[in-house]
Structures are given as structure tokens and as C-alpha cells.
Amino acid sequence: MFKIDEEKCKKCRMCVKECPVHAVYYEKKDKGAIVEITEKCVECGICKRVCKFGAIENDAPLESVITCSSCPIQCKVPLGETGACTRYRNVGGKLVRDRELVVEALEQKEAADNIKKPIITAVGAGTNYPCSKPAPHIVSECRDGVDVVTVVTEAPLSYSGLVIKLDTNTYIGEEGDPVYRDGKVVGMVNTEEYGSKMIAIGGANRLTGDNGFATARTIVELANGEEVELKVNKKIVLKLKAGVAPVIDGVEESIMRIGCGSATVGLFAKRMKDAVDECIVIDHHVIGLCSEHLAGEAVGMTWSGIIPNATKSSRGRYFGGHGSGIGGTSLETPRDAIKGADMSIAKAGMQVMVVNTTGEIYALFELKADGSFDEIPMTEAALGVALAIQDNCQRSMTSILYTGGTGGSARGGVCTHPVKITEAVHEQKAVLTIGGAPAFVYPGGGINFMVDTQKVVNKAFTWVPTPATVAPVEYTMTVADYEAMGGHMDQIKDVSEYK
């Protein structure tokens, strides 16, 4: 377990706040305070990582602890306690999942099949304004013996924007960095997803701000499948178009990463072991070191003594710095990924492979007796590792998701009790589609949705100078439910008038 060096401890209580198993005891005294690490400690290392004063030290290990292997941290779990994740408990000397397996999933509300697709789309429907007027087209047909109605309108939405997903590891800036169109801020870099960079464009505040017209135009052009050039921090140039690979600073992306560096080791540890003595996988999120990784241990490897040029997180997993280098890191060349070697463990002649998470950048090095490294030609086995990574990567693509909120006055064109259509959408009694495409409706109040623009009818979006974007909105439900919410029954037309 760990202990606290009283001379170094400043009683800041950061370790107390962050310990996931509440193993750090704090008591305020008349003269100072007591901070102690109790026998609940699982050696997860959080206290060491948050202590700015180096006051956390290793102590003698407790008896009857079990090392957990369910994640890279490898908690030392005392009898009767759980590890840092609180999932596994030491019960009588055996680690047991602290919750029974749940077999039955929660029941979900699902719309009936006969209302999942609109009878007609709203593309080209027009808008009846003000919104107290019935929607431009209210159309019915009989499906499976049930009368169904679709209400359509092209709704101006000031609450609208885009979520852009770029399948790339290439550095495009930090979260929150401004995104420009023709010198005007139209969005920002968002929190990234696994294997993809994310950008947010628009939103109500940007649409009503000084750059609202540029923002509306950008949303619509991207949503309609046009190519648009954006800049992050007025430096990094992005050429984006839905359904094709992003172009970043003039370089077209080809494939997206197979996973982070740790995941790549986990997937190919056996192949790496058979090919080389060590493999470093470069990634901006987690750099993998095969021999030290638990996946390397699982195939019979022990730490090679090779030290990667990154900050250690846990066994075989290291954090690299963000930058314009390989895999979105600050490493410009494969050689930069090797910091050095512990020659008390490493042996001259060792072959060290460095590869990125798409398998497109790779090199092989040989360790010399003086601790230096010489690059050598790739062996067939080492090249096989890189090709295996490449073969398991997906094509890089730009995805454009349109987001909007239709919970305002546009509901007046649907019915005379607007809250009823909102409730019906959430109860799956009415299905919202956008240009014929299924939409994800956010939980909670209102009708806030997200839709994949590649599934929407082509060129379906426009904008008005209020400014706001205009989206084709369809609501489909049974005629009985429509009447119950105060629908405009006298405006219903049979589908035969349209087809």
C-alpha cells in the first residue's frame, strides 16, 4: 500500500478528494491536521498523480491482497474491499464482480411500424407563416388497416447547427479552439470521439450573433453536401464535404486509426511478439509499448527495457504530447518515439519497431551496445504487422450531423395543443423525420433532434436572413392520435392527390 510522508505533505487534501475508495483519512486537529492512508488502499496511484508535493510513497504490501487484471491499473485489492472501479470485490481471497449479471434489458418505447416512415417528405413543401396557420401539407393514407397522417413543413430553426465528425488522428487544434469561415467565427473544436475529431458549427447564439449569416450559410452548404473550407485558429485549413475524406492542410486523409496505441497492442500483441523484440505504437491519445503491456505479458513477453518518449500512465500505456507530428503527437519521426533503453535489461541487437495506429508510418531500429539505435530495413514479419493494422482500418470519412429544435411555434402548424405533439414524439406515438431520414430525439423536454445529413433527401436545407436555417420536418402518427391532439383535421388530404 501507500503511505504519506508527513514532512512533504501540505494537508491540501487533494488525495482525500480524489481517492475512489475513500482510503485516505483526514482529521483536523487544534494544531494542524492528520492525513493517513488506511488499509483500504488499492494502490491505484491516483493519490500519487494528484499530489503536487511528492508526499505519497510506497509502503510494505498488505497481506491477503489480490492483484486485479481487469484493467491496466492492476489494483491490489484487500480482503473485503473493492478496487478503484468498485466493480470487483475481494471475497474470501477471490475477486468477484460486485454486481450480478443483468440479463433483461429495460423495455423501450418503440414506434409502430406503420408510422416509422413519412407518407411524403417536407422537401419542397414550403412554409405557412405565421405558424398559427396549418402546415402546408397534411396527408393521410391507410397502412395495415390503420389510417396514418404525415404533417410536413419547412421550418425555420434559429436553434440549429452541425456536429461534424472527421475520421482522423491528425491534429486540428485543442478543444474549444475557434473555427473560422472566411475570417468569421462559425464554430469551435469539440470534444473528440474515438478515432475522430469533432467540430461544432452554429447554434442559436452564433446564428443571432455578428457572424450569423456566415454561420447559416456554412450550416446549409455542409448539410447539403457541398465542400466548404474552414480554418481552426486561422491556421489549420480544413476542406470538408459529407461522405468523403477530410483534407487537412492540403493532405487528404485515407484511413482512420484502428484504435489507440494501447488498443493496437491489444489486438496484435502476438503478431508483434513474433516479428520483433519490441513494438511502440504512436498515438496522440495513448502510446502503446508491447512488451510492458498486459497484452504483451499475455503472449509471454516481459519488459524489454525500451523506454518510449512519452509520459507513463499505466503498464505499457503512455501519454504523448499533442502536435502536428505522427498520429497527432509531437513526434515528427519514428525515431523520436524511442527515448532510450535501460541497458541492464535491454540487449544489443534487439529489434524495435515503431508504427502508427493506421499502419501507414513505420520503421525498424536495432539497439546497439552503447544504447544508441540504428534504423534497419523492415523485415517481412515487421512489415506484416504494419499491413495487418492497415487491413483492419476503416476508410476515413467526413460525417455531417444536423441538429435542431422544433419545439417552438412550428408546432402550431401541426395542432392546436402544441405540447401534445411534443409529448407524442417522446412517447413514440408520433415519429419525427427530417427530409425522410430518421432522427434521434434528445431526451427531456422540447423536440431537439440530430440527423445524419447523408440520409436526408439531397439539397434539403436552406436558410433565411433572420438568420435561421430551414429544415424539412415531418411528423407521422395515426389519424386517431392526430385528432386527439387537436390536429387540423379539415386540412387532411388523401395521398392519392400526391401520387
UniProtKB/Swiss-Prot annotation:
Keywords: 2Fe-2S, 4Fe-4S, Iron, Iron-sulfur, Metal-binding, Oxidoreductase, Repeat
A Pfam family that the UniProt record links to this protein: Fer4_10
Quaternary structure note: Homotetramer.
Organism per entry: Eubacterium barkeri (Clostridium barkeri)
Cofactors that this protein relies on: an oxidized flavin; [2Fe-2S] cluster; [4Fe-4S] cluster
Cofactor note: Binds 1 flavin covalently per subunit. Binds 1 [2Fe-2S] cluster per subunit.
A GO MF term: 2 iron, 2 sulfur cluster binding
Pathway: Cofactor degradation; nicotinate degradation; propanoate and pyruvate from 6-hydroxynicotinate: step 1/8
GO biological process: nicotinate catabolic process
Position of the signal peptide: none
The UniProt record lists the keyword rRNA-binding: no
Residues bound to [4Fe-4S] cluster 1: C9, C12, C15, C51
Descriptive protein name: 6-hydroxynicotinate reductase
